[in-house]
Amino acid sequence: MLHVSASKNMTEYFKSILNDVNNLYFIAEECRKLGYDVVDKVEIPLAKDMADRVEGIVGPPKVSERIRELVMELGKEPAALEIAKEIVEGRFGEFGKEEGAEQAVRTALAVITEGIVAAPLEGIAHVKIKKNHDGTEYLAIYFAGPIRSAGGTAQALAVLVGDYVRKNMNLDKFKPTDDEVERYGEEIDLYQSEVTTFQYQPKIEEIRTAVRNISVEITGEATDDVEVSGHRDLERVETNQIRGGALLALVEGVLLKAPKILRHVDKLEIEGWNWLKELKNKKEEINEDIKDEKEDFNYEEEEDLSQYDDCEIEEVTKFIGEVIAGRPVFAHPSKKGGFRLRYGRSRNTGFATDGFHPAIMYLVDDFMAVGTQLKTERPGKATCVVPVDSIDPPIVKLNNHSVLKIDTVEKAIKYRKDVLEILFLGDILVNYGDFLENNHVMLPSSWCVEWYEKILKVNNIPYSTEFISNPSPKEAVKFAITTKTPLHPVYTYHWHDISKENIYSLRNWILRGNFNKNSDKWEISYDLENPEDISNKRFLELIGCCHEVVDGKIFILEYYPLLYSLGYDYENSFDSVENLEEKVSNAKNNMHLINLLSHFEIRRNTYIYVGARMGRPEKAASRKMKPPVNGLFPIGNAGALVRLINKAVEGGKTDEIEISNVMCSCGKVSLYKKCPFCGKSVIPTGPTRIKLPIKDYWYNALENLKINKPGDVKCIKGMTSKDKIIEPLEKAILRAVNDVYVFKDGTTRFDCTDVPVTHFKPCEINVSVNRLKELGYLRDINGNSLENDKQVLELKVQDVIVPESCMDYFLNVSKFIDDLLEKYYKKNRYYNSSNKEDLVGHLIIGMAPHTSAGMVGRIVGYSKANVGYAHPYFHASKRRNCDGDEDAFFLLLDAFLNFSKKFLPDKRGGQMDAPLVLTTILDPKEVDGEVHNMDSMWEYPLEFYEKSLEMVTPKEIKKLMETVEDRLGKDEQYEGIGYTHETLKIDEGPLICSYKTLGSMMDKTSAQLAVAKKIRATDERDVAEKVIQSHFVPDLIGNLRAFSRQGVRCKCGAKYRRIPLKGVCRKCGSRLILTVSKGAVEKYMNVSQTMAEKYNVSDYIKQRLEIIRSGIDSLFTNDKRKQVKIEDFFK
């Protein structure tokens, strides 16, 4: 019986997945029982829900059933507090005081974070009971760096849980000394100057208030090699170094999330947190939290804006504060011609991913590929690029000065080399859910066909579908006049981008022209030497009116709506505007004037232009350690720098290695639980240092596998795990034979950028209709039987569409697994795959690097895009959104057979990115809550567009919208999710970002600035300055500092912080090598100075570069004086 509400179809789907999981689990268990592996059973426990995950990751045993009861009764956060209370009361076994407190905090935090992220394990180092100076006892929580993975809210709630545990243990409050209070302020300043910045920059008084009032001590381990200089050697602070985890919990937890903590405190009636209200009020007064406060947006006119009024919204410049070399700026903040805000969701957008017209992806020189991350101005901090061809395309000016709307990919490819200027970048499609998630005020909607259609529907005005999507110029004008409705959006120009005086000038200039019957276009004489012609031609470009320039004449094809918009009755050859100068004078603004002139209502085309710059390029690549290795079998320095075990054997080399081992009764050293030479079960102990019998193990493994010449096999130098237990060498050999690589935990992974998709076409995923029917896809979104590969199907929530390169890699991995089953475990092959299509239907694990829980998925197909397509629920189950991050896929049977906790590094964060537990069935209620805000409608109502003009908060109009949250707990939570905008192909557009294909940094920056030069919404000089200031200068200074502080290394692998007195390696006597070279220090110097001169950056930046150049020269140039004779001065 499933624990989730689902239709009969979805229930069968989940049962199929469970059956496959259990089958693979059985196969792996049978293999593990043979005793060849580190542990004799599969080490990944299966979890059906959050409660199972919590018990599997942090415990205590038998807590899962109680968690289910409490969550059902109280809700997640109250349940977390109650379970913490019951743990310290001894309901789940007797613990010591400190042990019980630590278990309570970890378990409660695991409940809050859905049992997915690694923070409860790795983010809390330990919990101690310490003493105040008055002798009373208090609770101290030691946070570590991985607490970041929990997110700010969970970090704050961890502190709240600590306080709740403290009260139930009858402990006193933490009473800090003045020095301890000031220590936090010093650390926070030092962290931001030496390590990285926080999302929120607190005032010193806020820090003092928080530290003095929080009832538990927020402390932690040293995370960075930076020491405080003022408040050192404090009795209750064990380190003088920065405690990064503690600072994160304090700043990005308690201080940043104060409003959320208050809601929980009030709801749960927890005492001692009223001081947060005063803190919250102060923050609101100074508008610190730009994300949550509506006051950040200033309006020029009255608040209740109409669609005709000007709307001045404060630009957000944070996204452009740092510009990376080689990654273009596509639009400066709110700059005219930037991305036009369009509301809606396509089948491949939502959950922080926005849609862009595929044409613009080509026009910006392929810097926007499918999956490329953009840092955006609003509503969130970042997004992922995906194509949506049903939104407004870019408008460009060609080298011959013609202006053209590039509405197809074919046109974009044809004209891309002829583009002189990109006048308008086109739409950015953002769904309502992203505004709701970011608590960003709704911004006025652009005038679009879906809004226009709603007006016609509400007024019962008949129309055709063809008219809505593609009206002729005459149809649009006549329809507007006869029905007294606004002009169709297709012919509504950007009149607001020029002044009313410009409109007056443009009108007079256009009416000097005449109709050319031969070309069926409006013709205007154009003299390149005439300033009036030049300025009015520019006005024509700025309103987005397409035209051709041929032999000194301008030809306008869409003249009909243009003339009527300007008040000229073309049919009667009559200028209907009287007292033109008076109208211009009396008009409040440009939109007022154009409506006074026209024969119909003209809506404002665009209110908001959104700025954006490139973030990370898309990614689809196999996961490899550095350097890449085939197995977790250590050989020390025997394999030299290339770490090839076969070369070590050929050269007769070995090395001393610290490793678990035992002397078997057969007289051989066994590194495994079962002696590979006699087959006897043994118990390795250690770790101890031994001379590794590499040759014996190599030939034994080859004989066992019946392989003669496996080729090169790369191994590790040593294990970083606690017990130094190793993986069988046979696995490394088989991986090498099949050209696959291993990760730290024994699995073989493929990383790719997360992109959402809720619906797909069979032709997009390279799978036949018949195969899809076998996988349970029987009907399309309209209820019709699946017959052809162009029908749109709704993606099942645990199905994934992987990159083609991932399928190629997994094909190799499947062959490795089959070889492993057959040649090592002596079992039947499982996959038997000969091509990519054979892997469709097989199970994988999806996992994010900041988590410790995997999610079962099923391969349903593959695309050419270098991204991992999956349902938004699937990404949310990994605690991810889709703003450009990357996660991993790996075959489920590979994980069951090869994963072991014994391989994980014995260091802080070592258990992150490891499948310590596996969720088998996706429950939408237990995934990251951000996806609950995603809208699931097939269309937005008219009231939505009208309310957007009032700039209401998203919550004020939530009753108008349907989101995923409204479906939770019902059968509809899995099926019937809608989208508003169609797209032809989800992978249409460039597949590889230019950033990845360009070679040198000079090439990258040249291409970056070439893009900036041709975009109207971008200032190339400002881009050049920002690249130098935010990227090159810090790198140059940092590299100079690194050179002066560097250590040295030897080819044998030895490293020294300082050069030994002998001047050579103490281990082998070889010459020592610098770890930072001269080239690394000055690599950006020439490109920086070239850019500075070419783009005439400020004198300040030029002088900074000169000073850095001087520093580099003084470091590397020999200034030693030469002895000269006096006669040398007279030559």
Curated annotation (Swiss-Prot):
It catalyses: DNA(n) + a 2'-deoxyribonucleoside 5'-triphosphate = DNA(n+1) + diphosphate; Exonucleolytic cleavage in the 3'- to 5'-direction to yield nucleoside 5'-phosphates. Keywords: DNA replication, DNA-binding, DNA-directed DNA polymerase, Exonuclease, Hydrolase, Multifunctional enzyme, Nuclease, Nucleotidyltransferase, Transferase. Its EC number is 2.7.7.7, 3.1.11.1. InterPro entries: PolC_DP2 (IPR004475), PolC_DP2_cat_dom (IPR056172), PolC_DP2_central_dom (IPR056171), PolC_DP2_N (IPR016033). The keyword Magnesium does not apply. It comes from the Archaea. One of its GO terms (biological process) is DNA catabolic process. Pfam families: PolC_DP2_cat, PolC_DP2_central, PolC_DP2_N. One of its GO terms (molecular function) is DNA binding. The keyword Transferase applies. NCBIfam families: polC, PRK04023.1. Belongs to the archaeal DNA polymerase II family. Possesses two activities: a DNA synthesis (polymerase) and an exonucleolytic activity that degrades single-stranded DNA in the 3'- to 5'-direction. Has a template-primer preference which is characteristic of a replicative DNA polymerase. Heterodimer of a large subunit and a small subunit. This is DNA polymerase II large subunit. The gene is polC.
